[in-house]
UniProtKB/Swiss-Prot annotation:
It comes from Acinetobacter baumannii (strain ATCC 17978 / DSM 105126 / CIP 53.77 / LMG 1025 / NCDC KC755 / 5377). It catalyses: uroporphyrinogen III + 4 H(+) = coproporphyrinogen III + 4 CO2. Pfam families: URO-D (PF01208). The gene is hemE. This is Uroporphyrinogen decarboxylase. GO terms for cellular component: cytosol.
Length: 357
């Protein structure tokens, strides 16, 4: 494999010294970029974009041409696993992802096939290996999956939801059925992420996008415990380097202490949790990632710089000089001016030097 020219992202996740704060952005390859929209138009639709190796590689690399980012993230979707399990993923304009089938009964769970990620999701693995090769060691490549809880919400609801009516009904009325589904999904995610690592992913993020919809005990029982199982089942070293794992529960800032028990190397934060508070809670046991409100990028250059500097001041307030990766607190939105993220990225690199230089 090609020698990695910029490894500060991996080093920060492992709480090793860095020369400047590494940064990447959730959803950095996305609709806010005109070149992304052009490529998606060529592909025809979102799923075709994900499943075409050449297009998936192209859109992964696009933000790296514009911004001085310290990591690339595989362009794909968290719902590839449910799709491969036979639920029939499709997208309706303005309504987000939907499935032709739902999973709502014990028999539905029993009918789910065992995932063979290398065969069933070969297009993802082809994309990972192609992107890794195209990067040429420029920056590390992040692989990812949704958490079992988050995947289950889509599978039970049949698409996106704000109330999770059917999933929570299952959780309280038939918890054993939900546990069976989550266990099946945890095994699927382990296979999927290990296949990504074999294909060339150098770090992993688990997106627990809907963990924040749960009460405390339910979060631990139905989300966190399954992420713990996944991390215990992952290949943690490849080509002589550790494969760091990031857990990101949106709305999960109150659960940092239990999250540490997952075995993750780093915890992602949304913008509702102050970084200095989070630093004090984790006390150097894990790295942190985040957590600029994506809406900040709607502002002026001066307001973006001010917000980024305040974020970095919080991140380094307790004197720690590493164990931090700058990011947004959630995905960048399609309405952001492509000029604005450059201000974010450059300010992170320039201003953090006062703490790390």
């Amino acid at each position: 494999m090609t020698t990695l020219k910029n490894d500060r992202f991996l080093r920060a996740l492992l709480r090793e010294p860095v020369d400047t704060t590494p940064i990447w952005m959730m959803r950095q390859a996305g609709r806010y970029l005109p070149e992304y929209r052009e490529t998606r138009s060529k592909a025809g639709d979102f799923l075709s974009l994900c499943k075409n190796t050449e297009f998936a590689c192209e859109v992964t690399l696009q933000p790296l041409r514009r911004y001085d980012l310290d990591a690339a993230i595989l362009f794909s979707d968290i719902l590839t696993i449910p799709d491969a399990l036979g639920l029939g993923l499709y997208f309706e304009t303005g309504e987000g992802p939907k499935f032709h089938k739902t999973v709502r009964t014990e028999q539905d769970v029993a009918n789910l096939p065992k995932l063979n990620a290398k065969a069933d999701l070969d297009y993802v693995m082809n994309a990972v290996s192609t992107i890794r090769s195209a990067l040429g060691g420029q920056v590390p490549l992040i692989g990812f999956s949704g958490s079992p809880w988050t995947l289950a919400t889509y599978m039970v609801e049949g698409g996106s939801s704000k109330e999770f009516r059917f999933t929570k009904q299952m959780m309280y009325a038939q918890p054993e059925v939900l546990h069976a589904l989550l266990d099946h999904l945890a095994d699927s995610v382990i296979d999927y992420l290990n296949a990504q690592i074999d294909a060339g992913a150098q770090a992993i993020q688990i997106f627990d996008s809907w963990g924040g919809a749960l009460a405390h005990r339910e979060y631990v029982e139905f989300s966190l415990n399954y992420m713990k199982k996944i991390i215990a089942g992952l290949q943690r070293e490849k080509d002589g380097r550790r494969i760091p794992v990031i857990v990101f529960t949106k709305g999960g800032g109150q659960w940092l202490e239990p999250m540490i028990t997952t075995g993750a190397d780093a915890l992602g934060l949304d913008w509702t949790t102050p970084l200095n508070t989070a630093r004090n809670v984790v006390s150097g046991r894990v790295a942190l990632q985040g957590n600029l409100d994506p809406a900040v990028l709607y502002g002026s250059a001066a307001s973006i710089e001010k917000a980024v500097k305040a974020m970095l001041d919080d991140a380094y307030a307790n004197g720690e000089k590493t164990g931090y990766v700058a990011n947004l607190g959630h995905g960048i939105t399609q309405w952001v001016d492509p000029a604005q993220p450059k201000i974010f990225v450059d300010t992170v690199h320039e201003y953090s030097a006062k703490y790390l230089g």
